[in-house]
Amino acid sequence: MKLKVFNVREEEATLAQDWANRNHVELSMSEGPLTLETVNEVEGFDGIANAQIGPLDDAIYPLLKEMGIKQIAQRSAGVDMYNLELAKQHGIIISNVPSYSPESIAEFTVTIALNLIRKVELIRANVREQNFSWTLPIRGRVLGNMTVAIIGTGRIGLATAKIFKGFGCRVIGYDIYHNPMADGILEYVNSVEEAVEKADLVSLHMPPTAENTHLFNLDMFKQFKKGAILMNMARGALVETKDLLEALDQGLLEGAGIDTYEFEGPYIPKNCQGQDISDKDFLRLINHPKVIYTPHAAYYTDEAVKNLVEGALNACVEVVETGTTTTRVN
């Protein structure tokens, strides 16, 4: 069996080769993305493992079909970069890695939340200026006294809820599907609006859909509890960034922890030091004094990277051997 792997980082290459040696599979790895210019590299292979960031060109699907490719295994949980229906029309199975390390994202969410609540960024900035005074702007709150709303109570949302619960928080949640594992961990409310009205901290853990794109806009932020904090470790399109910045400037929100930005594709994960960034909203976001921005790094742990690499490659093998996979999304 021969598999083609795109968008491979050095750390992934080592893990992928270890997997290949154990499973007696031939791998060809490329640092570059799957594009119209590179799609011919797939000729003669049985499957593709990919880490697509921006939208995959629609013209690629029929070309893959012509070459006999029947699947793309995405090395992430999110698959919004693929045209799932078009892929299906061309007989291409798209799979993901739905549960590579919920704890990684959950722990990171709570870490950033604590940094915001205890004003760590401001304290560190003061210390760099040799300002060691105790003043009102650096006074924090006790996390355990806060009500936390989890929007999206799947694997990651529930893992996050458990940690907040461990701090003593009251945890409420909203999801169109109630998770039976959430009993005793959080209380479900009837709407997103009800959740944000009650919460001191709102944490997003939902996949992007046409219905929830820019759900968190200025109208929604006006319904937030005064002084609340927003955490988005899910997908950038859930939040209308211009409105978030306005809500922060107006004092509707006290702060925001943002790990995903809707138009991050040109920048993440790249080293852009010394380069001009043309996206003014992105610049405002990453430099806003009330925002802790991180570059889609919430998942980034040893465990998660290993599980993503091996999960995608296992899905490739499963499709080749059985015609489908348990992690199929289309």
From Swiss-Prot:
It is an enzyme of class 1 (oxidoreductase). PROSITE patterns: D_2_HYDROXYACID_DH_1, D_2_HYDROXYACID_DH_3. It catalyses: (R)-lactate + NAD(+) = pyruvate + NADH + H(+). Keywords: NAD, Oxidoreductase. Its EC number is 1.1.1.28. The active site is at 235, 264, 296 (proton donor). NAD(+) binds at residues 155-156, 175, 206-207, 212, 233-235, 259. One of its GO terms (molecular function) is NAD binding. It holds the Pfam family 2-Hacid_dh. PANTHER family: 2-HYDROXYACID DEHYDROGENASE HOMOLOG 1-RELATED (PTHR43026:SF1). Belongs to the D-isomer specific 2-hydroxyacid dehydrogenase family. This is D-lactate dehydrogenase. It comes from Streptococcus agalactiae serotype III (strain NEM316).
